Amino acid sequence: SRLPAALRETIGRYFRDQVAVDPDHEFVVYPDRALRWTYKEFDERTDNLARGLLAIGMRPGDHLGVWARNIPDWLTFMYATAKIGVVMVTVNPVYKSHELDYVLKQSDMKALCVIDAYRDVDYLKIIRDLVPETLTQQRGYLESENYPFLKNIIYMGPEKHRAAIACRSSCCWEAMCERRW
């Protein structure tokens, strides 16, 4: 190929090479959370999440939305979706109800990952209002009249808020990351 080597390189391939070359080197650092992951730790975490996404029915080409501010989980979803060929749809963290409604209808999202809130935006309330089925349907079997592609809500947050989005109908982030097949 006539392309320079740097243009032929993918982020995934570069990341895998770094894991092989220097697995114990820090890759993710969030000082405000006292969080540090090495290449190896992050690789394992994203592999586990990728397996969890496959287990809930995500397939190459499917769209997964992430509605969150800049947090470690956002980065984890970015790499996990790339590993399995799922398209990550980033949702602006300051979007309100009408904007999320538009994105859900236009993006064919099969799953939406959310945190509880950001600034003055209560994500969980917006989800309950837009997708009331989350309050009555079982986890993993979401059938929404307004969003026919949407099958799962994945909540990334503290256990104390799980009931706010009816855990019966949402996939739990920690459970997905901890699964090992």
Pin down the residues of each PLM region.
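Short, histidine-centered active-site or binding-site loop motifs used for metal coordination
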Residues: 1, 31-34, 108
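Flexible, low-complexity linker/hinge segments
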Residues: 2-10, 164-181
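Short, flexible loop segments at the rims of nucleotide/cofactor-binding pockets, characterized by
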Residues: 3-6, 41, 89-92
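AMP-dependent adenylate-forming
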Residues: 14-38, 158-161
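Aromatic/hydrophobic pocket-lining residues that form π-stacking "cages" and hydrophobic walls in ligand
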Residues: 15, 77, 127
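A generic structural signal for well-ordered alpha-helical segments
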Residues: 18-19, 81, 104
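Conserved AMP-binding/adenylate-forming core of the ANL superfamily
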Residues: 27-79, 98-101, 169-175, 180
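Structural core segment of the AMP-binding/adenylate-forming
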Residues: 56, 84-172
